[in-house]
């Protein structure tokens, strides 16, 4: 695998390399080969992955046909750092941060 380094920008080249490796499935392969996997365990894992893929495909098909509601998009601003429970900042309240 080869990545060009332009203008001595190593960070950008490293980012490109990681992206290529991710696309090729090298990280997943390394994780799987990190230890020995018995053939029976491999078969069970592959079967579970196939079931997961089939369920995901069926769910997407039902969503496209309108029989299942679409997955709600995340609402930014709620949760950590939202209206409540933050650590001060602008509009923190009458006493401000403690």
UniProtKB/Swiss-Prot annotation:
<dbReference type="InterPro" id="IPR001911">
    <property type="entry name" value="Ribosomal_bS21"/>
</dbReference>
<dbReference type="GO" id="GO:1990904">
    <property type="term" value="C:ribonucleoprotein complex"/>
</dbReference>
<protein>
    <recommendedName>
        <fullName>Small ribosomal subunit protein bS21B</fullName>
    </recommendedName>
</protein>
<feature type="compositionally biased region" description="Gly residues">
    <location>
        <begin position="78"/>
        <end position="98"/>
    </location>
</feature>
<dbReference type="Pfam" id="PF01165">
    <property type="entry name" value="Ribosomal_S21"/>
</dbReference>
<comment type="similarity">
    <text>Belongs to the bacterial ribosomal protein bS21 family.</text>
</comment>
<dbReference type="InterPro" id="IPR018278">
    <property type="entry name" value="Ribosomal_bS21_CS"/>
</dbReference>
<dbReference type="GO" id="GO:0003735">
    <property type="term" value="F:structural constituent of ribosome"/>
</dbReference>
<keyword id="KW-0689">Ribosomal protein</keyword>
<feature type="region of interest" description="Disordered">
    <location>
        <begin position="61"/>
        <end position="98"/>
    </location>
</feature>
<keyword id="KW-0687">Ribonucleoprotein</keyword>
<dbReference type="InterPro" id="IPR038380">
    <property type="entry name" value="Ribosomal_bS21_sf"/>
</dbReference>
<dbReference type="GO" id="GO:0005840">
    <property type="term" value="C:ribosome"/>
</dbReference>
<dbReference type="GO" id="GO:0006412">
    <property type="term" value="P:translation"/>
</dbReference>
